[in-house]
Amino acid sequence: MSQTNPKVGIVSLGCSKALVDSERILTKLRAEGYDISGSYDGADVVIVNTCGFLDSARAESLEAIGEALAENGKVIVTGCMGGDEKAIRSAHPSVLAVSGPHQYQAVVEAVHAAIPPLHDPKLSLVPPEGLHLTPHHYAYLKISEGCNNSCSFCIIPDIRGPLMSRPAADVLGEAERLAEAGVRELLVISQDTSAYGLDLRHAESTWRGRPVRAHLTDLASALGELGIWIRLHYVYPYPHVDEIIPLMAEGKILPYLDIPFQHASPNVLKAMRRPANQEKVLGRIRSWRETCPDLTLRSTFIVGFPGETEEDFDSLLGWLEEAQLDRVGCFKYEDVKGAPANAFADQVDEDVKEERHQRFMEAARQIADERGAAKEGTRIEVIIDEVDEEGAIGRSKADSPEVDGAVFMNGETDLEPGDLVIVEVEAAEDYDLWGDVVERLPPPRPRR
């Protein structure tokens, strides 16, 4: 009787960058003959890819490790919290191995030790685009690791190291393989997307027979040749971001920018060790919208940062009203083990954080309501994410998966995930839209 391939399960916690790490680990293991299990009891060993950014995330990671141990018994730990092996083994001494973020080979070797592969590697087991944990029609494209910033509330540089960009040809080759495999949307991610290529001194590499610089503008322009949706995340407002907006106006990449502004008060931004000229940023936002009227701006903010006064918070609300951001997320400040901000004076009370968070999100909701109402009666392009007996759910060019709004098409049951359609918007509420399909679009075609 032939033996069955060993099976590996994975629990992936945290951000989209960690999800890409999980995909790369699974791709390596699949190439060596391992099968992937979607359940604890079906796996011979379970990998837990942890998050270690916030204290609450560390607690969630420890809880997930404990659950995996209870349900399976054989657990390998990796990811951002993996750098603190002492804390992990103190809570869970029976884990098989612990490694830090993007240490793919260490994880593979730990799996080998727990349950060896049955045969030599066979790359034919893996599709050219690798294995992905997202739906088939979209994928994350990680262009760099690490970060060179020194924000006082963050320990990412300590966890993931300094900026390490991938050569442009490497990124574009992966993107091309994904597009050829049927991916309709690529979400470009990193810790600091605008800094892409700085560590490489923007060196050129060859793609499609021509040189392409490791620079965000050049990369975005080249990605636009694939003919699919290209969405930029984690874009810091460096001056050269102005060069990206015309590409959006031309339709090469989606008119969408995810920029983590974090705050607007100069005092708070200085304490955060972030750029503090938000008045200048307002001027740039106006200029961007003049160049690309359809531009969607998403951002995240932190309220209750140590030393944040009521005046600072009011400044943030005023700036938000002027900026008229389309999509907004907000976090209540919490300590991060090892971050300088932990030791700052004038920590804000939890009830004050909660009250400010509610006020901020209400202000953001009112802006979203007004901007959403302006879309009623218009026609927008939508990518389909889900279809069931009640209808279809998709996203517009203004909506990224998981974090933004959705477009609901009641009664549209003959669509499939990944389809592109034109929807006439009938109603809007908060970040969501409702409407009817008026046209089906053909599959995208690469631009050669």
Curated annotation (Swiss-Prot):
Keywords: 4Fe-4S, Cytoplasm, Iron, Iron-sulfur, Metal-binding, S-adenosyl-L-methionine, Transferase. It is found in: Cytoplasm. Its main location: cytoplasm. Its EC number is 2.8.4.4. One of its GO terms (molecular function) is aspartic acid methylthiotransferase activity. Belongs to the methylthiotransferase family. RimO subfamily. This is Ribosomal protein uS12 methylthiotransferase RimO. It comes from Paramagnetospirillum magneticum (strain ATCC 700264 / AMB-1). The gene is rimO.
